[in-house]
Regions:
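Metalloprotease/metallohydrolase-associated module, dominated by Zn2+-dependent proteases
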Residues: 2-6, 10-42, 49, 79-169
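Membrane-targeting and insertion segments and their boundary/processing signals
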Residues: 35-43, 60-63, 67
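Short pre-active-site segment immediately N-terminal to the catalytic Zn-binding motif
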Residues: 46-65, 79-84
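Catalytic glutamate of the conserved HExxH
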Residues: 64, 68-76
Length: 169
């Protein structure tokens, strides 16, 4: 648990600790993955596992942890009979996240954007542009430029080496 708490914003550590002590689940911190921030799965032996990317952004880490804990709660209550990001998950996610939704834990603009996001949360926080931009302010500096900041006609490349040109809308 200490490893998990080391990634959490300090004002949220006690709440997270209490939540995790009441939750029979294994949590593993992984190196950064390109396709997801976290993952929940039921293992063959019947136990549950959450994997979370190690990230220097404590707010992204906390949001991802709460997102995956909502999957765990839904799996406990409904087994595998519901959609992964359906109404049951959205309700569970709101219930878990709301106690953390205050400016002592999430600074503005994250707090206000996250409150709006919770009205109808997406399967991934990366699908909410305003939330992505609010969280980005707490990521380490990057030499990468987001595509939306490029001018029409500019070239850009992906990590796999593929090169593209930004076109006009």
């Amino acid at each position: 648990m200490e490893q998990v708490l080391s990634f959490i914003p300090t004002p949220a550590k006690l709440q997270v600790e209490e939540l995790l002590e009441a939750t029979p689940i294994e949590i593993k911190i992984t190196p950064k993955r390109l396709t997801k921030h976290g993952d929940f799965r039921r293992q063959a032996n019947g136990t549950s596992l959450i994997t979370l990317n190690a990230t220097p952004n404590p707010y992204r880490f906390l949001i991802t942890l709460l997102h995956e804990l909502a999957h765990f709660k839904v799996s406990q209550q409904f087994s595998l009979r519901v959609k992964p990001h359906g109404a049951e998950w959205k309700t569970a996610y709101r219930k878990i996240l709301v106690p953390f939704l205050n400016p002592e834990i999430f600074p503005d603009p994250i707090c206000s954007v996250l409150a709006r996001h919770m009205k109808n949360p997406k399967a991934s926080t990366d699908r909410d542009f305003k939330l992505v931009m609010a969280l980005r302010k707490y990521d380490p500096p990057s030499l990468k430029t987001p595509v939306f900041e490029l001018e029409s006609g500019q070239y850009f490349s992906l990590d796999n080496g593929r090169v593209f040109t930004k076109l006009k809308k």
